[in-house]
């Protein structure tokens, strides 16, 4: 007997074949004398998802380490001082030069010992050769043979020492050449260091000046200058107006003086006219002065004729 799920029960969607595998197994129970069997579905996760998870995890770790390194480099770069870095670089180069000189001295000492050993071996070889000659002259061939064996041993040792000595000389020449190159580089680095330090100091000064200028409130300063300019212009206008008023006052006073002078002249002329003869001849076109002394305006004949004609026309209308 099998128990099947009703049609309305939930169903699992079939997973992709690349990510998981399914296997159905029958499970027997003691319920109803073991006649009931259940079918279980076992899900096995394939290695594909596991590999994908590992790849994503490693990618995230790489990105995180890259970000941390970038921030660390940025922090270190912000703390780097060009002057101190240059001084430290020169000190390290001097330390390397000292170590190279010490190594050269040690190699030279070893070369000197090899030379002494080589000379001693050659000297011993020559001595045993002379002894072999002496023994042969005395008729002792066995002794001469032993002397030649000793001589050969020292000669072989001298040859070996000669090869080592030649090799040591090459090492010494290489060390001396590298030492001279390093010395020249250090001298050049010191010159560049002074130049770069001066440029770095100039750049720092320029940066500080730029920061100071950037912190200055130029808008407030310009507005203050504009206000002071307006104030100065107002003061100049006020001074100009006061000067103009003072000039007008002086001109008015002089005009009054000139007017009084004209009045005086006119009065003087009236006195002269009144004191003269009342029936004297006047200039043509003017009437005589009355006996009362009141002056009447002079009349022009042409004007009087035109005036009479106008009066006639007015009366006709």
Swiss-Prot record:
Residues 265-317 are annotated as: Disordered. It is found in: Plastid, Chloroplast inner membrane; Plastid, Chloroplast thylakoid membrane. Keywords: Chloroplast, Coiled coil, Host-virus interaction, Membrane, Plastid, Plastid inner membrane, Thylakoid, Transit peptide. GO terms for cellular component: chloroplast inner membrane; chloroplast thylakoid membrane. The keyword Cell membrane does not apply. It comes from the Eukaryota. Residues 92-246 form a coiled coil. It comes from Oryza sativa subsp. japonica (Rice). This is Membrane-associated protein VIPP1, chloroplastic. It is a peripheral membrane protein. It holds the Pfam family PspA_IM30. Belongs to the PspA/Vipp/IM30 family. Residues 297-317 have a biased composition (Basic and acidic residues). Homomultimer. Complex formation involves interaction via the central alpha-helical domain (71-286). PANTHER family: MEMBRANE-ASSOCIATED PROTEIN VIPP1, CHLOROPLASTIC, PHAGE SHOCK PROTEIN A. Required for plastid vesicle formation and thylakoid membrane biogenesis, but not for functional assembly of thylakoid protein complexes. GO terms for biological process: thylakoid membrane organization; vesicle organization. InterPro entries: PspA_VIPP1.
